[in-house]
Amino acid sequence: MKDGTGLREFQKEFPKRFFDVGIAEQHAITMSAGMAKEGMIPVIPIYSSFYQRAYDQVIHDVAMQNLPVIMCVDRAGCVGADGETHQGTLDMAFFRLVPNLTIMAPKDFKELEDMLEFAVKLNKPVIIRYPRGGEDSKVKFERHENIELGKAEVLKKFIDEEKSNKTKILQKIGDKVFNNKTQRERVTIIAIGKMVARAMDIGQRLQEKMDVEVINARFLKPLDDNTIIESIKKTKNVITIEDGTIINGLATAVKEVIVNNNLQGVKIKSYAYPDEFIKHGSVDELEKIYGLDEENIINGVNKS
């Protein structure tokens, strides 16, 4: 699978560090566990849907032994032309169940590089999931914070936090005069992986009507509870966006944070793939069908 996973050039440059075990995902995981046991740090790129075949080996040979194996989940999320059997919408859900696994998803190529470097140094089993294809061409992230275990990245702060003291005083006066009618709505948008770029687009479009905070979760496990709680306490209004199933992914994790910390009066709306097998179609077509496109999410926020 060196072509499908984009490793042909690596194989040419480092032939002695490259092993193609064929279509044998179970063997690939167990072999990697053995290599890790002997002091190496193996990196394994396998398609999301193919990890299902090696789930037993991930649990018993890697996670239970707490070995430093870096499992790269290629074709995560909707895969488009690869077809229904290759849709990668289940991996966050089934990996989140497994003890000892750290689960990450980068927002762009640079963050993927940073996560790989972080994973090599972590000395624990790691999942890094990423989609088929390239980056979102409309959004370019100029700032990249260092990767810290279980730490999210706040990409967009509230507009009113950037205002001068004079502006804030004038707004408070206006609030009193107009019976708080000048108070803007607030929303926290939490996204992971490729959907972070979409969250930023949505945040930019919504900022004329409301104050928006966009959080790049980075880690599904461990989730950055503190950053999420801090934001939710300010907004009481949460949107989650992910390219995985609605069950046991980011939406579930954020709802657990809200319930476990007894956060009252919080509205939450989640955008993810439904609890069904995703049909064949292009990524754009399927995102529109399942309500993950930008226009549908913006309309949903405006109606909430």
Language-model-detected regions and their locations in the chain:
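Thiamine diphosphate
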Residues: M1-K124, G134, ...
